[in-house]
């Protein structure tokens, strides 16, 4: 919802800069595919602000399932500054998993929200802020979510087997001051890490 803070020109400039840098970007209705040694990952994007809002993403997810081996859904939605996810958001995320999502990650609330595993699939309801210059009072906690996959290919069929071999959470502080160039910083103190996780 902030992609047009600087108007259409700002949005298009950002897309062009990402393209020049070779960084993939996504938006509602645009599936991004990445292929590594024949293994294809699809990234599906969408917005969810109320019950049933995942329906548009289900169309993209169906296409992604037909054209890739692993599907990541990244959604934007939910109530801001609330640490608990809403029942409707949980139901929508479960629906995405039921329709083939292999990982579901959320954003928008500006705060961390819980994670859960549903039918073997990890759902991260909100990663909070990461790089944020919108105001000087964001929640100062965020994390990097790192999911490790082991992929094996069947020599006879060529098909892939994917195993989730672990999740690493890297707690970070969010900084909004220009002196730090708005860059997040990894939390090194073990006690402080526990406050985030």
Give the role of each language-model region:
Residues 1-197:
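Acidic, metal/ion-coordinating pockets
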């Amino acid at each position: 919802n902030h992609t047009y803070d600087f108007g259409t020109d700002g949005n298009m400039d950002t897309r062009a800069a990402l393209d020049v840098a070779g960084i993939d970007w996504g938006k509602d209705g645009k599936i991004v595919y990445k292929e590594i040694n024949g293994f294809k990952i699809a990234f599906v994007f969408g917005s969810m602000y109320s019950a049933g809002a995942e329906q548009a993403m289900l169309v993209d997810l169906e296409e992604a399932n037909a054209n890739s081996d692993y599907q990541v859904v990244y959604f934007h939605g939910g109530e801001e500054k609330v640490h608990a996810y809403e029942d409707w958001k949980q139901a929508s995320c479960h629906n995405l998993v039921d329709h083939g999502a292999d990982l579901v990650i959320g954003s928008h609330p500006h705060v961390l929200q819980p994670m859960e595993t549903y039918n073997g699939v990890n759902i991260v309801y909100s990663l909070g802020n990461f790089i944020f210059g919108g105001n000087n009072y964001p929640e100062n906690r965020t994390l990097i979510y790192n999911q490790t996959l082991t992929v094996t290919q069947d020599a006879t069929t060529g098909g892939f087997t994917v195993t989730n071999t672990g999740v690493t959470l890297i707690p970070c502080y969010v900084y909004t001051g220009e002196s730090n160039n708005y860059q997040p910083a990894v939390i090194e103190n073990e006690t402080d890490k526990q406050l985030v996780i």
